[in-house]
Amino acid sequence: MAVVLRLQRVGKKQQPQYRIVAIEKKSAVGSEAKEVVGHYNPCNAKAADQIKLNQERYDYWVKVGAKASPTVAALAKKASAK
């Protein structure tokens, strides 16, 4: 099965927070992820605290063949620039 890196929404109404997860491509939206690689909180006022990504695990999943969604790829690029 193909593994992808994508966002999984968590949080309250009107206060979105996302997990960056490694998950099977055909899995349902709320299903259990193989691994949580990071977190993204767009509501956080501090830009430095919006993205928390375990770069080592992200690189591992990409190396193994997981394909990142365009949004996750952009967030990873932004996180590595810090």
Curated annotation (Swiss-Prot):
Family: Belongs to the bacterial ribosomal protein bS16 family.
GO biological process: translation
Keywords carried by this UniProt record: Ribonucleoprotein, Ribosomal protein
Cellular-component GO terms for this entry: cytoplasm; small ribosomal subunit
Lineage of the organism: Bacteria, Pseudomonadati, Elusimicrobiota, Elusimicrobia, Elusimicrobiales
Highest taxon of the lineage: Bacteria
Pfam families: Ribosomal_S16 (PF00886)
Molecular functions per Gene Ontology: structural constituent of ribosome
Name of the protein this chain belongs to: Small ribosomal subunit protein bS16
